[in-house]
């Protein structure tokens, strides 16, 4: 989706989420040359009651922690992997993923001009999930926030995710 984005400040990050406490992680691009501010690549938020089941199916009790790693597998195509694979979130308090398309060219369909077709493509952007690298991608219910240049989705569990149309 993007060829001219600045590099990411970090392509991977790890933190501990504790059931009963809110947790979040942000990944950022590096600032462009001559600029002080950078732009956000993604936000990941876990509510205090989001953690539900470990990958082995066992319940996560209040106060238990889970080590979470987010790795950008392909920054040009906005592909991200979340570990531990198989972690499940509560349906009443799902985790929230926001992926930003701030660094994506305004000519999103790459036809050489910025026009209404690009706006239509932006409205069709969605977060997609892939259970394993060899399996197909499936669309996740998502909301485009065009003015903020981002797509939001609630996550039921961990796997690979990408922003696409």
Spans of model-derived segments:
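Proline-anchored loop/turn motifs at beta-strand termini and strand-loop-strand connectors
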Residues: 28-61, 100-102
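C-terminal beta-strand-rich structural cap/linker in extracellular carbohydrate-active enzymes
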Residues: 150-165
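Eukaryotic short linear interaction motifs
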Residues: 106, 135-136, 161
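Surface-exposed loop/edge segments in extracytoplasmic proteins
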Residues: 80, 133-142
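Short, solvent-exposed loop/turn segments in extracellular or other extracytoplasmic domains
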Residues: 144-148
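Beta-strand secondary-structure signal
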Residues: 43, 96-98, 152
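Proteolytic processing hotspots in large secreted/extracellular or virion-associated proteins
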Residues: 2-32, 62-132
């Amino acid at each position: 989706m993007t060829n001219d984005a600045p590099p990411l400040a970090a392509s991977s990050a790890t933190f501990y989420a504790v059931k009963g406490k809110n947790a979040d992680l942000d990944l950022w691009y590096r600032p462009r040359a001559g600029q002080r501010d950078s732009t956000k690549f993604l936000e990941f938020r876990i509510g205090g009651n989001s953690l539900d089941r470990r990958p082995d199916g066992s319940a996560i009790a209040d106060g238990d922690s889970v080590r979470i790693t987010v790795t950008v597998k392909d920054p040009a195509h906005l592909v991200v992997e979340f570990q531990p694979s198989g972690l499940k979130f509560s349906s009443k308090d799902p985790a929230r993923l926001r992926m930003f398309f701030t660094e994506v060219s305004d000519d999103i369909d790459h036809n050489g001009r910025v026009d209404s077709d690009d706006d239509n493509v932006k409205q069709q952007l969605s977060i997609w999930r892939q259970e394993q690298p060899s399996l197909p991608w499936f669309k996740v219910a998502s909301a485009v926030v065009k003015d903020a240049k981002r797509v939001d989705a609630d996550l039921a569990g961990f796997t690979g995710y990408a922003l696409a149309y």
